[in-house]
């Protein structure tokens, strides 16, 4: 799977460890950097790349994961979720067809982050009657703006 990643400067070491982990799982990972202190810039860049179909998924990092989630969700076609437990990481994919997850380097330890990333990347969204209509409604709103 092709994965786009990025972070703010505070999460650089965290991101590097998790890039190594994702590559070890066999994923092709492209790093969009961490130099810009305005995390919205890297989050929207990753969002644009994922929404354009250049990458299968995205993973973003900042202190809490909330800021990069908010910024990425401003990009048309992005459905980003901040995840902090394995169930939510799986459901982000299975129920919500999220194409980006976000994690907080200051609130999620390295081992848990690896579990969350694996849970998310191991899932495939399959349209179904229950969740599909909800995702369609989100996409309809997104396409209307």
How would you name each of these model-derived features?
Residues 46-83:
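Helix-adjacent hinge/juxtasegments
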Residues 2, 13, 30-32:
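Helix-termini ("caps") and immediately adjacent flexible loops/tails
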Residues 4-6, 10, 86-145:
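C-terminal binding/interaction regions
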Residues 4-25:
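Glycine-rich phosphate/diphosphate-binding loop of Rossmann-like nucleotide-binding domains
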Residues 1-2, 23, 46, 143-145:
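SAM-dependent methyltransferases
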